[in-house]
């Protein structure tokens, strides 16, 4: 999820805020604390009511008899295995004793609201759809659309493809 913001702080045009000495967007503490968000999540095994510890065992690549393919259903949150302490990353904190699903939602909101998301994602999309070397103006226009639309991908793709530089 931290890959959504890139490695260095960016201006809206996709260039580093300090080109001569780039500022990292996150560090080891951010990574460790964000990893704690995912504690208590595992596959949705049939034993989750009677033997939840079985849901955290690695059974190999074969599926136990009587089980359906566990990789085709959403993961399940197991509150008893979730780290209930507060988690601080990217300068924001998820409060202690927040249930696993709410912790995940709040964490994704923290990442999505980071100032790097709009320019980083916009530049990546432009590079995949139109040109590998977009101008800073092109990135700024698309990043502004991304930000103003709260990250709506349909609106962002339209801005990418309808921009004069895409023609």
Regions found by a protein language model. Give the residues of each.
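Active-site substrate-binding loop specific to GH73 endo-beta-N-acetylglucosaminidase modules
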Residues: 1-167
């Amino acid at each position: 999820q931290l890959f959504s913001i890139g490695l260095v702080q960016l201006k809206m045009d996709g260039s580093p805020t300090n080109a001569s000495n780039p500022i990292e967007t996150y560090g080891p503490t951010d990574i460790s604390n964000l990893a704690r968000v995912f504690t208590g999540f595992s596959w949705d095994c049939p034993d989750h009511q009677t033997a939840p510890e079985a849901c955290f065992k690695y059974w190999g690549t074969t599926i136990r008899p009587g089980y359906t393919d566990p990789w085709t259903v959403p993961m399940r949150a197991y509150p008893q295995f979730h780290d209930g302490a507060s988690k601080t990353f990217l300068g924001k904190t998820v409060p202690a004793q927040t249930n696993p699903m709410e912790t995940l939602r709040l964490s994704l909101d923290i990442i999505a609201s980071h100032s790097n998301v709009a320019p980083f994602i916009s530049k990546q999309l432009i590079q995949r759809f139109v040109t590998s070397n977009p101008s800073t103006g092109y990135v700024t226009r698309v990043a502004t659309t991304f930000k103003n639309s709260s990250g709506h991908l349909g609106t962002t793709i339209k801005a990418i493809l309808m921009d004069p530089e895409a023609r």
